[in-house]
């Protein structure tokens, strides 16, 4: 009996240790990080659409714009959308190569440098949209690969295209209203995906408001 009891105790302790390990949230998987990445994702595409009439993160959106505006007399818009798709793809593939041959644990930080440098330099140079868009798209492609498979706590999400996050939030809310299953887990899912979706929308609105006031002023000083 003593041996049997010890075995049961060991099994319980092992399960408890595994549960504790599962509850450990890495720094990149916190709600704060999810909110920041969602904010950046929403703000980046709104800025590029308002400033360049092109998207850099939602490339399916660029394809739709190309088809919908095929009669657009401004060839510059078409060129920027094509270049955005091309350089986003190149940036994503370059980042994929770097990830496969990484030799340091800080590879994610290095792959954020291109987008960081571009966003610092753009306000300092003259307005040349056909040149600026490819660089932003390249850095965004690298960032997309860097955060592929991102988690907010234990739930996977996408930092740029938030339709999937919104769908998961609605699914969790529906299950909560049904009152069946693990309600605590569903509430946590709804909260986490709600944070990502809310921060994405907040980033988009914030940039749109800033562009309304800053954009005309910036042009008067060029």
Where are these regions (language model features)?
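Conserved small/polar residues in nucleotide/adenosyl-binding loops
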Residues: 1-7, 220-221
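Short, positively charged and aromatic/hydrophobic N-terminal segments
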Residues: 8-13
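Alpha-helical transmembrane segments of multi-pass membrane proteins
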Residues: 16-17, 21-222
């Amino acid at each position: 009996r003593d041996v049997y009891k010890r075995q049961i105790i060991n099994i319980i302790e092992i399960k408890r240790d595994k549960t504790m390990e599962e509850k450990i949230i890495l720094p990149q998987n916190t709600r704060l990080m999810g909110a920041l990445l969602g904010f950046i994702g929403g703000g980046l595409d709104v800025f590029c659409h308002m400033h360049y009439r092109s998207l850099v993160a939602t490339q399916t959106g660029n394809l739709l714009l190309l088809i919908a505006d095929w009669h657009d007399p401004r060839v510059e818009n078409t060129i920027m959308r094509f270049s955005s798709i091309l350089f986003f793809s190149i940036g994503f593939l370059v980042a994929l190569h770097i990830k496969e041959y990484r030799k340091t644990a800080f590879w994610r930080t290095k792959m954020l440098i291109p987008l960081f440098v571009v966003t610092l330099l753009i306000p300092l140079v003259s307005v040349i949209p056909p040149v600026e868009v490819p660089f932003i798209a390249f850095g965004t492609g690298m960032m997309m690969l860097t955060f592929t498979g991102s988690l907010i706590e234990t739930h996977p999400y996408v930092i740029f295209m938030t339709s999937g996050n919104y769908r998961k939030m609605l699914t969790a809310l529906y299950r909560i209203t049904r009152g069946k299953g693990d309600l605590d887990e569903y509430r946590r899912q709804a909260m986490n995906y709600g944070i990502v979706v809310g921060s994405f929308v907040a980033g988009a609105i914030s940039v749109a408001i800033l562009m309304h006031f800053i954009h005309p002023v910036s042009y008067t000083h060029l």
